[in-house]
Amino acid sequence: MVHENLNGRVAVITGGGGVLCSGFAKDLAAQGVKVAILDLREDAAKKVADEINAAGGTALEVGCNVLESESLEAAREKINAELGSCDILINGAGGNS
């Protein structure tokens, strides 16, 4: 099901390189949402962003430690500059360690 009212919105997904949140990211991108994939493991975030972009979506990977305010501020600045301000937040960081 396509939700046209999501088209062009910006979603920020922490923990976006993981299994569950990467699924959220891909589903939102399929709805036309521009997705910022935040993850402590930037390589994992890049893999998800590359998959979304290759499928015709818009995604940006951002290496970010959600426990550090400086890291969050840098992420916010990058996202705002490249995608726009956040409309949707999915806070999935936390891991299974």
Question: What do these predicted regions represent?
Answer:
Residues E4-A36:
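Canonical Rossmann dinucleotide-binding motif of NAD(H)/NADP(H)-dependent dehydrogenases/reductases
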Residues V10, K34-A36, T58-L60, S85-D87:
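Structural signature of beta-strand start/N-cap positions in the alpha/beta core
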Residues L20, A45-V48, I52:
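Generic hydrophobic, amphipathic alpha-helix propensity
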Residues S22, K26, A30, K46, ...:
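Amphipathic, non-transmembrane alpha-helical secondary structure
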Residues Q31-K47:
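Conserved glycine-rich Rossmann-like NAD(P)H-binding loop of the short-chain dehydrogenase/reductase
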Residues A49, N53, A59-G63, E68-C86:
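Conserved amphipathic alpha-helix within the SDR
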Residues G92-S97:
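Conserved NAD(P)H cofactor-binding loop of Rossmann-fold oxidoreductase domains
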